[in-house]
UniProtKB/Swiss-Prot annotation:
Compartments, as annotated in UniProt: Nucleus
CDD domains named in the record: LSm11_M (cd01739)
Organism phylogeny: Eukaryota, Metazoa, Chordata, Craniata, Vertebrata
Protein name (Swiss-Prot/TrEMBL): U7 snRNA-associated Sm-like protein LSm11
Species of the source: Xenopus laevis
Description of how the protein assembles with itself and partners: Component of the heptameric ring U7 snRNP complex.
Function description: Component of the U7 snRNP complex that is involved in the histone 3'-end pre-mRNA processing. Increases U7 snRNA levels but not histone 3'-end pre-mRNA processing activity, when overexpressed. Binds specifically to the Sm-binding site of U7 snRNA.
């Protein structure tokens, strides 16, 4: 075999030659390599892994001994970029056409809120509210409670939505407190005519409306009589007491006096001025332009 290697010409060991003898090249220790500085792999699996991983496989093989510290742990270093792989990726990229029109950026949507949706209600009852907002027309809003009418708010509207929720400024409110207790079943239901008729009756002695006090005179109910102001005529008004039997004192038994409770006027009307107010749509009963 050694004699054949000595007699074999150099073309039999040349990989690029047509007369290359692979069996002779495997057993020959002097087989010339086309690239003398080529990297050697241990087996084909390592070579295939290098082809699939590119720079990663090369970096793993080159830095296998350097990637571990003295404690045996791997260091989280990124591998160096492979220029050959970068060139291959650049060749796969499609060329950019010079005369191509650039893509326009997406337009930002206009904000949608209560103020932008108010003009969209033109031609409807809500469109009239928008006209009152633009022309600053004073309106009146009738507000209800769980039983019926509560009061009237007169002012300028600044915002509203499709549910009839509205914000108003410079508001003058005329209202009556809700009826509670047994009076709920006995008092007549409040109407707009009764509300303003009651207000006219209370006008002569009006109080400060800003504090929510009643617009009419104070109640003319008398205060409950005190112990010191009790007259002897009131004491004698009770039923006659028979004299007690012998052996008992003849003093009369004390009578219990009941304090009279102040009568609450549920028909009392109040007025107040508000700088701004928010009215929920479920409480709106009627809206009309103030004359």
């Amino acid at each position: 075999m050694a004699e054949e290697e000595d007699e074999a010409p150099g073309s039999c060991l040349d990989v690029s030659s047509e007369s290359f003898n692979p069996l002779l090249a495997l057993y020959s220790p002097q087989t010339p390599l086309p690239f003398p500085d080529i990297r050697c792999f241990n087996n084909l699996a390592e070579y295939e892994s290098f082809l699939r991983g590119g720079a990663r496989g090369r970096a793993r093989g080159a830095q296998r001994g350097q990637s571990r510290g003295p404690g045996g742990k791997r260091k989280g270093r990124k591998p160096e970029p492979d220029p050959e792989r970068i060139e291959r990726l650049k060749q796969l990229m499609l060329p950019v056409e010079e005369g191509k029109v650039p893509v326009r950026p997406r337009r930002s949507r206009a904000p949608k809120n209560v103020l932008t949706r108010m003009p969209l209600h033109a031609g409807s009852p809500l469109g009239e509210l928008n006209r009152c907002v633009q022309d600053r027309i004073r309106i009146r809003v009738h507000i209800r409670t769980f039983k019926g009418l509560r009061g009237v708010c007169s002012g300028f509207i600044v915002a509203f939505d499709k549910f009839w929720n509205m914000a108003m400024v410079d508001v003058d409110e005329t209202y009556r407190k809700p009826v509670l207790g047994k009076a709920f079943y006995n008092e007549p239901q409040l109407t707009l005519t009764r509300l303003f008729d009651r207000l006219q009756l209370q006008e002569p002695g009006s109080h400060d409306p800003a504090k929510g006090r009643p617009a009419g005179p104070a109640e003319t109910l008398t205060a409950p009589p005190s112990k010191k102001s009790t007259q002897p005529s009131e004491r004698a008004a009770g039923p006659p007491v028979e004299p007690g039997p012998q052996g008992h004192s003849g003093n009369r038994p004390k009578q219990r006096r009941r304090n009279r409770k102040e009568k609450v006027d549920y028909q009392q009307v109040f007025t107040r001025h508000l700088k701004q107010i928010f009215i929920r749509g479920e409480n709106v009963l009627l809206v009309h332009i103030a004359e």
